[in-house]
From Swiss-Prot:
It is a peripheral membrane protein. This is Regulatory ATPase RavA. GO terms for molecular function: ATP binding; ATP hydrolysis activity; identical protein binding. The gene is ravA. Signal peptide: none annotated.
Length: 498
């Protein structure tokens, strides 16, 4: 076997050659190439005139000396037009019912069938055997067929509960194509003088028969790690719970796994990675509704679970909660304690500030943030004279929230431990403390847990960075995963700064 990274580079260059002159079809070309390299079938859905047939023709050039067959189905198409005419000579001389297959589907490596759903039962039945078993019954003989890629196309989906569903289920990759959208690409397409039938692939990049056969065995040796299987099973269970989810047969799941193995193999890896699971978005949908649903579920899987994003956030939440508990346990020791004055028999208890509190403006920290006057508040600034008067005589007390703006009216009280407590509208309280009176920095227990969590985050991010070099995965998906990991990292760093 060639060095894995050299193989990945070669396949990338091969795909780039196949994509030349085709605008906004890179993803379709890459998945069709992956299907061809792993012996799978593709269904292209889209309106006429959007290069569906050209995609199939291009794939012929991926292989040395590959033969191609393409046919436009109609309601009147006959098996002879697809599988070859009967041999009159064999029937006349020997009474054998045998087809002349040269130039037809049974002898082609690349097959393109347009308007596939218009095929009649006789064609469909033979086609199913060809896809499933790579065999063709020609008279009394069963012949192996060399088909590496079947591309079927239509501008519509098969009717539900029709005889076409069996064939549709064999189309592992399903791609929904549209017209060229980008203005610059549209202009380039209109003015391009490239002959679409020219071979754009250098001979050195084309796949030989020996390489193709060897790769089929090596694809099967790619491992499926336990954590990747758990992600697949999680997706399957989630789909089973949704009432509108499409039915996905066990056969389709099994074929999809081989596609994931091929993606890993041609990306230079020895095992399927979570990033390969994004390919399932093009394998599991049935119609427009299920296409959106499948993409949503895989997006949740990729941005929430594939690199332990949700698990790390859950751990972070537990660490933050523990930090709050420790802060609350320390509140009695760190809180500002006022001095109770005499006057037991007076109507209102009087207090005064400690003698060491002498600043004209006092900034008091909330042991836990509160939402006051529609603002998340972490500290309050008081005029010392106003606070002294309130402690002595009661009445209204005002302070600047987070030290800014006008002084706002506050619900402030002295608790039984002689601590100042501010309350929000729901009467949730937070003890006030002088700056520097609270514990310095994070507790050792919390600091260690956050460092371990950050280390795990770095490992997951490094894994993703290594795995994202995958030709067959669109860049926008990789961008969303990167953003989800960066969000987790930012929350961890924020917690470390508290």
């Amino acid at each position: 076997m060639a060095h894995p990274h050299l193989l990945a580079e070669r396949i990338s260059r091969l795909s780039s050659s196949l994509e030349k002159g085709l605008y906004e079809r890179s993803h379709a070309i890459r998945l069709c190439l992956l299907a061809a390299l792993s012996g799978e079938s593709v269904f292209l859905l889209g309106p006429p005139g959007i290069a569906k047939s050209l995609i199939a023709r291009r794939l012929k050039f991926a292989f040395q000396n590959a033969r191609a067959f393409e046919y436009l189905m109609t309601r009147f198409s006959t098996p002879e037009e697809v599988f070859g005419p009967l041999s009159i000579q064999a029937l006349k001389d020997e009474g054998r019912y045998e087809r002349l297959t040269s130039g037809y589907l049974p002898e082609a490596e690349i097959v393109f069938l347009d308007e596939i759903w218009k095929a009649g039962p006789a064609i469909l039945n033979t086609l199913l055997t060809a896809i499933n078993e790579r065999q063709f019954r020609n008279g009394a003989h069963v012949e192996k067929i060399p088909m590496r890629l079947l591309v079927a196309a239509s501008n519509e989906l098969p009717e539900a509960d029709s005889s076409l569903e069996a064939l549709y289920d064999r189309m592992l990759i399903r791609l929904w194509l549209d017209k060229v959208q980008d203005k610059a690409n549209f202009r380039s397409m209109l003015t391009s003088q490239q002959d679409e039938n020219d071979n754009p692939v250098p001979d050195a990049l084309q796949v030989t028969d020996e390489e193709y056969e060897r790769w089929q065995k090596e694809i099967g040796e790619i491992t499926l790690p336990d954590h990747v299987f758990e992600l697949i099973f999680m997706l399957r269970q989630q789909l089973d719970k949704l009432p509108d989810a499409p039915y996905v047969s066990d056969r389709r799941w099994k074929k999809a796994i081989r596609l994931l193995q091929a993606s890993a193999f041609f990306s230079g890896r020895s095992a399927v990675a979570p990033v390969d699971l994004i390919l399932l978005k093009d394998c599991l949908w049935y119609d427009a509704q299920s296409l959106n649903l499948i993409q949503q579920q895989i997006d949740v899987l990729m941005t929430g679970h594939a690199w332990q994003q949700q698990g790390m956030l859950t751990r972070l939440g537990a660490i933050v909660q523990r930090h709050l508990q420790l802060q609350q346990q320390q509140s009695d020791k760190t809180a500002l304690t006022v001095i109770r004055l005499g006057g037991i028999f007076s109507r209102r208890q009087q207090y005064q500030l400690p003698v060491n509190v002498t600043a004209s403006t006092l900034t008091l920290l909330l042991q836990k943030p509160l939402k006051l006057h529609d603002m998340e508040v972490v500290h309050i600034s008081f005029e010392r004279s106003a606070l002294e008067q309130w402690l002595s005589k009661g009445g209204e007390i005002r302070g600047k929230l987070n030290g800014i703006g006008f002084a706002q009216k506050l619900n402030l009280e002295v608790d039984s431990a002689q601590h100042l407590v501010v309350r929000d509208v729901s009467l949730q309280g937070s003890t006030l403390a002088l700056p520097g009176s609270s514990a310095e920095g994070l507790p050792g227990e919390i600091k260690q847990q956050l460092e371990e969590l950050e280390s795990d985050w770095r490992k997951q991010h490094a894994l993703f960075s290594e795995q994202q070099k995958c030709l067959f995965i669109p860049g926008d998906w990789l961008g969303r995963i990167e953003a989800s990991l960066q969000d987790v990292g930012a929350q961890i760093r924020q917690a470390q700064q508290c």
